[in-house]
Amino acid sequence: MEAIAKHQFARVSAQKGRLVADQIRGLPVEKALDILAYSPKAAAGLIKKVLESAIANAEHNEGADIDELKVSRVFLDEGPTMKRIKPRAKGRADRIFKRTSHITVVVSDS
C-alpha cells in the first residue's frame, strides 16, 4: 500500500531541497518528522508539510497504521524558473533566477 503527496511549484531550488530529501529517504515517518522539525534548512519545512499530507492520505484513503509507515520514496524535480532583472551600475542588468521545484513524497507500509 502506497500513499502519495505532492507540492508543485515550491519556491525552493531542487538542488537545495534534495539535500534535505536525502536525509529522510527510507526512514520510518516518526523519525523523518523529527529530523525535518529540527533541520535549519528552509526546504525542510516544505518537505515536512508534504510528508504530513502523505501520512494523512495513507491513514484516510488506505486505512494504514501510521506506526508502520516508512518514507519509501522522496524526490524533488525541477520546476519552472522565474527570471527577474536586477539593475546594476552604468545601465547594465543582472539576471536573477528564482527557481522552483516539485516535491513528491511516497509513504508505504512495506
UniProtKB/Swiss-Prot annotation:
SUPFAM superfamilies: Ribosomal protein L22. CDD domains: Ribosomal_L22. PROSITE patterns: RIBOSOMAL_L22. It holds the Pfam family Ribosomal_L22. Keywords: Ribonucleoprotein, Ribosomal protein, RNA-binding, rRNA-binding. Gene3D superfamilies: Ribosomal protein L22/L17 (3.90.470.10). InterPro entries: Ribosomal_uL22, Ribosomal_uL22_bac/chlpt-type, Ribosomal_uL22_bac/org-type, Ribosomal_uL22_CS, Ribosomal_uL22_sf. The keyword Protease does not apply. GO terms for biological process: translation. GO terms for molecular function: rRNA binding; structural constituent of ribosome. One of its GO terms (cellular component) is cytosolic large ribosomal subunit. Part of the 50S ribosomal subunit. HAMAP family: Ribosomal_uL22_B. Belongs to the universal ribosomal protein uL22 family. This protein binds specifically to 23S rRNA; its binding is stimulated by other ribosomal proteins, e.g. L4, L17, and L20. It is important during the early stages of 50S assembly. It makes multiple contacts with different domains of the 23S rRNA in the assembled 50S subunit and ribosome. This is Large ribosomal subunit protein uL22. It comes from Idiomarina loihiensis (strain ATCC BAA-735 / DSM 15497 / L2-TR). The lineage of its organism: Bacteria, Pseudomonadati, Pseudomonadota, Gammaproteobacteria, Alteromonadales. The gene is rplV.
